[in-house]
């Protein structure tokens, strides 16, 4: 099996129905409000630094809470779910819809039959690293010609 670092430098292509590495991913029993939802997950990729990853996730009928300890953008691939957000708003999302959950958010999920999503998960950098990254970017821009100039600076990438 390839390591995360190997995967980061080797492109990967998956067909919609090429899912063979599903593992059980039970909804925390304390979060289940109704029914007996059965969830599975399949890891697809991770960034070299481990801060970002993608997964297929699916779940059968049930109602449960979900708490996000990282940023997650999800794309509904199949089925539908009604999401009730902590501010009281509700939204029914279906295949093709995209939802973003920032770290620290939560939602009540009501899955009528089945849901399958593609999840893009990202762990935010600590504040001091964001500041350092931004400083490096500013330094790199110092040597660049303005975009309209077309000449490119000595630090252009």
Role assignments for model-derived ranges:
Residues 59, 68-83:
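Short, conserved beta-strand element in jelly-roll/cupin
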Residues 127-157:
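Acidic/histidine-enriched, glycine/proline-rich intrinsically disordered or flexible terminal extensions
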Residues 43, 50-68:
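Conserved short histidine dyad/triad with adjacent acidic residue
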């Amino acid at each position: 099996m390839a390591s995360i670092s190997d995967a980061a430098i080797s492109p990967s292509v998956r067909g919609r129905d090429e899912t063979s590495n599903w593992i059980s991913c039970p909804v925390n029993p304390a979060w289940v409000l109704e029914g007996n939802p059965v969830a599975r997950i399949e890891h697809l990729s991770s960034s070299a630094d481990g801060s970002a990853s993608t997964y297929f996730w699916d779940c059968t009928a049930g109602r449960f809470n979900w708490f996000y300890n990282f940023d997650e953008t999800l794309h509904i691939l199949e089925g539908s779910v009604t999401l009730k957000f902590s501010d009281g708003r509700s939204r029914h999302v279906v295949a093709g819809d995209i939802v973003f959950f920032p770290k620290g958010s939560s939602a009540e999920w009501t899955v009528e039959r089945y849901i399958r999503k593609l999840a893009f998960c990202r762990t935010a950098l600590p504040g001091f690293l964001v500041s350092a990254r931004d400083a490096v970017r500013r330094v790199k821009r110092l040597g660049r010609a303005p975009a309209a100039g077309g000449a490119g600076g000595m630090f252009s990438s």
